[in-house]
Each structure stands twice: as structure tokens, then as C-alpha cells.
Amino acid sequence: MSKRCYYEVLEVSREAQEGEIKRAYRKKAMEFHPDRNPGNAEAEEKFKEAAEAYDVLRDPEKRSRYDRFGHQGMNGMNGGFGGFQSSEDIFGAFGDIFGDIFGFGGGGRGANRMQAGSDLRYNLTVSFRDAAKGTEVELNIPVTDTCDTCEGSGSAPGTSPETCSHCGGRGAVEQNQGFFRISVPCPACNGRGKVITDPCSECRGAGYVRKQKDLNVRIPAGVDNGSRLRLRGEGEAGMNGGPHGDLYVVITVEPDKVFKRQGQDLVLSTEITFVQAALGYKLEVPTLDEPIEMDIPKGTQSGEVFQLRGLGLPYLGSSHKGDLLVEVKVKTPTGLNSRQEELLREFEALDEEKPMKKVKKLFKKAKDKVMGE
């Protein structure tokens, strides 16, 4: 039976990069691994086929030769599956792959490797003014952290874990699985390679405890809904001496009664009388600090927007600020008394006379010109 194209086996293109080839092999190895397909001869063959393809395509020299000459070009090279004498050879060669997938490499080499702790998320709601000016808050976070009593060893103070006698400290034992002899986590020590004979009374041998952690967090000025603050090392504790994960504080900003937000600009809507709009006015405008006076020019129309530069929200990590946008709405008077109505009608009549006077002047000029001729 003729061999399939290695690119076809891993389902990648001939232009695939190293990372893409590795991901494709991980997928195939996970799908056809003997542990997941006990007694399945077809899966076993596909597992070997994928290992052979990956061994060639991951190596630039072998891949170049294969691209030029195909399978015939691999004869005489220690490449392809012919270079592996047993499943241990496969797990040994690709231990990083199997360690990522199953938590340990061939022969248990990855059983006790360090693992980073999980990241945590904390949702924090702040007021509009605190988001604008910045603030400091105290958080109380539930976390899984290293036990202070045993310092993470899991053993009672003054004692230490002992090497597992079942696996000799390897964290894994070998089992026959069809064609392969594979490594699986040691059932006696759960893959740790060590056993705790005198467990810590505080964590009961786990090495970790659930507790509340108090943190003071500085919220920078200018944060918005959805802003994320990353606190390195404040997440869950790592395994086997691995680093802590991170804590992500996700911000929600409460709405404000006075201002609305457009990016880093503040928007304020205010009303003035039609007299103030017509004659001009000095308007007191609230800001994030002290109120200021703004000139409303004569003839201002309802809906006009005035821009006050630098009175908005600060940009994160910058001294620059957005603007304050003041939208003016002219209020139409209601509930007028008779005298007010009379004055308004007089005003309207005076306003209507102006164009008629202009027309009469034009006719007079035209008449004088004709008579003069």
C-alpha cells in the first residue's frame, strides 16, 4: 500500500509554517492516541502515520528533501517512522507535544513540571467621577493560594514528601496498549512522583488553601466601561513551584446625572431663556472641578454646541484631556400673562415692519431716479 502525502496526513498546505504543522500534529495525536482508542487498530495506524509525517515536516532538512524527491528521497535517512523502534521513541521525540496534551511527557518527564496558576477576573463598578478623576479601592478576592503552614509542600511542618515507591519518583508507569508500550500517570501518587505520609493539618496535604486576599488597587483616571486592569501575580497559585496567574479587574462605570460621555469628551445639555439667547448671557457651567462662566453670544440658536477645550476626561496614560461640549437648548416661555403676550405681539409687529420699510425705501429711490431723469 502506497504512503499518503505527509501534508495530506496532517491536513496542511505545502506552504504551512512550523507552528501550523505542530498544531496540526497535536490535533492528530490527540485524536488517534492509543489511550483514547484502546484496541482500535485503524487509529493506531493513523497515530503512527501522523508521527512519521510530523517527524519529517518539522525538520527543515528532511522537509526540503521530501519536497524535492517525495517518499523516495527519505530512503537511507533516519527519518519517517522507520527511525522509531517503539512507542517510547515517539513519546521521547515528541515529549513536549504529549506533555501539553496529557499533562506529562513520555516516561513521566513532565509529571512534576511547573505550571502557572489560573488567571482570575473581578468585576468592579466605579462612579462616573471616580472613573474621571481616578481613585484607589480595596478589593477582597477569593483565591486558591499556597498554604502558609507548609509553604505548599503539603506535608506537616518538619516533614517532607517521600519519593513514590510505586513509580520510583517518575510520576508515571508503563502499560502495554496494543502495539505500544505507553506511559500513564502513576495511580499511587497521581503523577506527582512523591507521596505525603504526614499531611499538613491546615491544607490536608493539598499544599493549597482557599482564602480571601485583600488588595489595594489604583484605578487610573479616564477608565471606561470594559477597561481591564492587569495585576500580575495576583491570580491563583501555580503548581509545583509555578508562578501565580494574573488578576484582571474589569471596570463598569456608573452613569452620571449631569454629564454624558463620548469617548474622552464630556457632553452637557443646558437650557436658557429666549431672551438670554437673543441678547447674550454669561452662563455658569459645571465641570469635573469648579463651575466656570461661559459667554452665550447674541442670537444663539437652540441646539448649538459650544466646545470648551481640555475640560473633558483624561486619556489613559497621558496628560491630554478631551473637551467639554455644552449643548444649549432655548426654552420657549409658557403661562404668559396678558402684558407679556402684548409685548411679544408688539415685538413681532416691529420685526415684521422692517422688511416693509426696506421695500418702501427701494420704491422711493426708484421713483426719485425716474422723476429726476
UniProtKB/Swiss-Prot annotation:
Pfam families: DnaJ (PF00226), DnaJ_C (PF01556), DnaJ_CXXCXGXG (PF00684)
CXXCXGXG motif repeat residues: 147-154, 164-171, 186-193, 200-207
Compartment(s): Cytoplasm
Zn-finger region bounds: CR-type: 134-212
InterPro entries: DnaJ (IPR012724), DnaJ_C (IPR002939), DnaJ_domain (IPR001623), DnaJ_domain_CS (IPR018253), HSP40/DnaJ_pept-bd (IPR008971), HSP_DnaJ_Cys-rich_dom (IPR001305), HSP_DnaJ_Cys-rich_dom_sf (IPR036410), J_dom_sf (IPR036869)
Alphabetical GO biological process terms: chaperone cofactor-dependent protein refolding; DNA replication; protein refolding; response to heat
CDD domains, per the entry: DnaJ (cd06257), DnaJ_C (cd10747), DnaJ_zf (cd10719)
Binding site for Zn(2+) 1: 147, 150, 200, 203
Cofactor annotation comment: Binds 2 Zn(2+) ions per monomer.
Binding-site positions, Zn(2+) 2: 164, 167, 186, 189
Keyword check for Repressor: no
Residue ranges constituting the J domain according to the UniProt record: 5-70
Entry's transmembrane regions: none
Keywords: Chaperone, Cytoplasm, DNA replication, Metal-binding, Repeat, Stress response, Zinc, Zinc-finger
Molecular-function annotations in GO: ATP binding; heat shock protein binding; unfolded protein binding; zinc ion binding
Cofactor(s) named in the record: Zn(2+)
Family per record: Belongs to the DnaJ family.
Domain-related comment: The J domain is necessary and sufficient to stimulate DnaK ATPase activity. Zinc center 1 plays an important role in the autonomous, DnaK-independent chaperone activity of DnaJ. Zinc center 2 is essential for interaction with DnaK and for DnaJ activity.
Oligomer and partners: Homodimer.
Physiological role: Participates actively in the response to hyperosmotic and heat shock by preventing the aggregation of stress-denatured proteins and by disaggregating proteins, also in an autonomous, DnaK-independent fashion. Unfolded proteins bind initially to DnaJ; upon interaction with the DnaJ-bound protein, DnaK hydrolyzes its bound ATP, resulting in the formation of a stable complex. GrpE releases ADP from DnaK; ATP binding to DnaK triggers the release of the substrate protein, thus completing the reaction cycle.
PANTHER family, sorted: CHAPERONE PROTEIN DNAJ, DNAJ HOMOLOG 1, MITOCHONDRIAL-RELATED
Protein name, entry field: Chaperone protein DnaJ
